[in-house]
Structure formats: C-alpha cells, structure tokens
UniProtKB/Swiss-Prot annotation:
Annotated ranges, domain Deacetylase sirtuin-type: 1-254
Pfam family, one: SIR2
Protein name: NAD-dependent protein deacetylase
Source organism (scientific name): Thermodesulfovibrio yellowstonii (strain ATCC 51303 / DSM 11347 / YP87)
Family: Belongs to the sirtuin family. Class U subfamily.
Length: 256
C-alpha cells in the first residue's frame, strides 16, 4: 500500500536527520518551473528541434546553422530564468550543512544563482564558448552579439575556427574530471536526491546507480516514472519545487 505524501515527507526528514553525506543529482525537470523547457516531454526541446550531434557540429555547416538557430531562440529563455523553489531549497540545505554537493546535468547555472557553492556540471554550461582551433574563449555576451550580427555559423575572430559552446553534445565525451568527481561522490553518499531526470542519458545516468550499489538511500522527485524507480527508497511524482519546499519547511519547523 502506498504511503501518503505527508508520510513520505516525514520519512525523508528522518533520513536527512541520520545522514552524514547527502547529495542531489538533477536534470532538466528541476528547471521547467523556471521556464526552461526540458527535452523529452510533449513540449520539450526535441519536439521543437532536431538533435545535432558533436560529429555533425564539427563537420557540417548546415548542422551548425541548425544548432545556432536553436540556441538563438532558447538562449534568452535561459538568461531570463530565475531559480525556483527547488533550486532555492537545495541552496538552503547546503547552507545548513545538510547537502554536500549538487551534481547536475543542466547547463543553465540556476543552482549557482540560487546560492549552491558545490556544484558539479556534468554537461558543461552555457556561460562559455571556445574556438576549437586556437582555443580563444568567448564570453556569453560576445556570442549574443555575434548571433545578432552574423549568419548562423560562428567563427573565431582570430583564426577563423569554429566556435563551440562549452556544453557536452550528444556523441561528445563527458569531461573526465567532473565525471570522476561525481562517481567518487556517489560512492560516498548515504542519501541521493534524484530530481527532474528521466535517467536516459549515459554515462550521467549511472551516477544514481553507483550510489544505490554502495548502499545510499535514493529519493526520486519526478513528475513521471522512470525505468529506474525500483532503486528508490522514496518516490514523489510531483513538482520538485513543492516537494523540496515542504521538506525544507519541516526541517525549519524542527529547528534542525
């Protein structure tokens, strides 16, 4: 028999009280409440745009045009987005010493904006851009200017090389340092909140499994089911902002 929502909140609070090393693993679903679309939902990015792989981006000008067209449409949504209740709750948990790390697949920077200091970005971020030839770094502001003034194939002003955002494309290796750190944290944690992710993108999706295999209690917060729900100790099929705020409210009321 399923336990009630309030019983789940209470059980989560009891787990947090006993925890010495809790972490959060987040995906696109945590940021939808901030107005940033996710990938796989009926209104997600892959319903609106084709996936451009890393190999396509490198060799195919038409694919780069498609990517930058998508980026030009979406970048303002990301820039205008503000942290929501879920981001703010995770930042408050860290501030109280109840959360060691946030491991995120997101590129929006909202965890840092909310106040989290210990954030591992598995898929990079949208703040930086780099020439693939001479490695000149371009800030976001300069890229925005280029997108307004140039055709949709951004080139380095120094050497003419292809400019690429510092995000991880499909088919591109994940940054080794960040992946190794995430794996080490997953090995050590005793609680992992798994929030807003379908757990379909490898190797990032392996992180919660590593935590589970090493004895951690997993708390899933998703609006939909995933194929890995069976490894969770507690599952909330609800808004991340609502659930995390309610958990935080209990912590505050208990003065923990």
């Amino acid at each position: 028999m399923d336990i009630s929502y309030h019983e789940k909140i209470s059980k989560t609070y009891e787990l947090i009280k006993k925890s010495t090393y809790s972490v959060a693993f987040t995906g696109a679903g945590i940021s939808t409440e901030s107005g940033i679309p996710d990938f796989r939902s009926p209104n997600g990015l892959w319903q609106r745009f084709r996936i451009v792989t890393y190999q396509e981006f490198i060799i195919d000008r038409k694919a780069r045009n498609e990517f930058w067209k998508m980026k030009r449409e979406l970048i303002q949504e990301i820039i205008n987005a503000k942290p929501n209740n879920a981001h703010n709750a995770l930042a408050e948990l860290e501030k109280r010493g109840l959360l060691k790390y946030v491991i995120t697949q997101n590129i929006d920077g909202l965890h840092q904006m909310a106040g989290n200091k210990s954030v591992i970005e598995l898929h990079g971020n949208q703040r930086g851009y780099i020439c693939l030839d001479c490695e000149k770094v371009y800030p976001l502001e300069e890229v925005l200017k280029m997108l307004k003034e140039q055709e949709l194939d951004l080139r380095c002003e120094v050497c003419g090389g292809i400019i690429k955002p510092t995000i991880v494309f499909f088919g591109e290796p994940m940054p080794e340092k960040e992946l190794l750190m995430a794996q080490q944290i997953a090995n050590k944690c005793d609680i992992m909140f798994v929030i807003g992710t379908s757990l379909q993108v490898e190797p990032a999706a392996s992180i919660p499994r590593i935590a589970y295999q090493n004895g951690a209690k997993l708390i899933f917060i998703n609006k939909v089911q995933t194929e890995w729900d069976w490894i969770a100790e507690i599952i909330f099929y609800d808004s991340a902002g609502k659930v995390l705020k309610d958990i935080l409210d209990v912590i505050k009321s208990e003065k923990f």
